[in-house]
Amino acid sequence: MSSSTPVQPPAVGRVYLVGAGPGDPELLTLRAVRLLGKAEVVVYDHLVSPAVLNFVCPTAERIYAGKRRNEHTLRQEQINALLVRLAQEGKQVVRLKGGDPFIFGRGGEELQTLAKSGVAFEIVPGITAASGVSNYAGIPLTHRDYAQTCLFVTGHLRHDPHVGNDSNSADISGDIRADLDWPALTRPRQTVVIYMGLSGLADICRQLMAHGLAADWPIAIVQDGTLASQKVLVGSLADLPERAKTAGLTSPCLIIVGEVVKLHAELAWFSPDAM
């Protein structure tokens, strides 16, 4: 009777779509930290804070797949194909995205590709920038006296020829006027949060005023929210674009529009120096 070595079944790969939160690594979920510590490959985006990568297993392969305006390391189709290939090779892959992967992160599109290819996947939510950054800026998104509705908006849309086809790009470009529902953005008693809006700030403010908001309507812009480098500028639709330019703000920035912005002076608590 001959003996033979048992044939090992092929390793089964899996992709974990993980939200990295708004920047501060202490805002990661426990599950995100655990998965980063055991992943074989981590494919991460531009908006992932470098401090978050400290949780990655030292032996894991790290693949940067970030996109900025006019600077794409990999096209989206290449990223999709990469995730499929790694999983089919039997790897345990973390696809790491800034904020929450299902809010302006193209996570849904990537998972559609995995599903069509028969690749197993799981989703780990993260704190989206609107929530994390507004909290660190001391600006509640809803308040009984000011706002019962909150809208999340991105100025970077699918067909934008200047930026490319990636909502994780760090900024917007081109004419956004025809793409946003401006009347909806100027309704009373609501807060509007605009992702990736720094380069379009002047146009955004002009359009909001043209569609009915007062020139002195409160608006804030936050750079590097939740990080030690966080900067918060509060002003009006009329003056904030010039003030932001003078301050030399750079991406990533988040814009918050609405009367809740007035609460920043009272509720600001975050001191980067105390981190």
What is the meaning of each model-derived region?
Residues 2-3, 12-15, 88-93, 149, ...:
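A contiguous loop/helix-start segment that scaffolds small-molecule binding in enzyme catalytic cores
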Residues 61-75, 147-156, 192-193:
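Acidic/glycine-enriched edge-of-secondary-structure segments
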Residues 1-25, 30-127, 132, 241, ...:
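Class I S-adenosyl-L-methionine
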Residues 60-67, 118-122, 141-148, 212-221:
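Short hydrophobic/aromatic-enriched beta-strand-loop microsegments
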Residues 98-188, 231-234:
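Class I SAM-dependent methyltransferase SAM-binding "motif I" and its flanking Rossmann-like core
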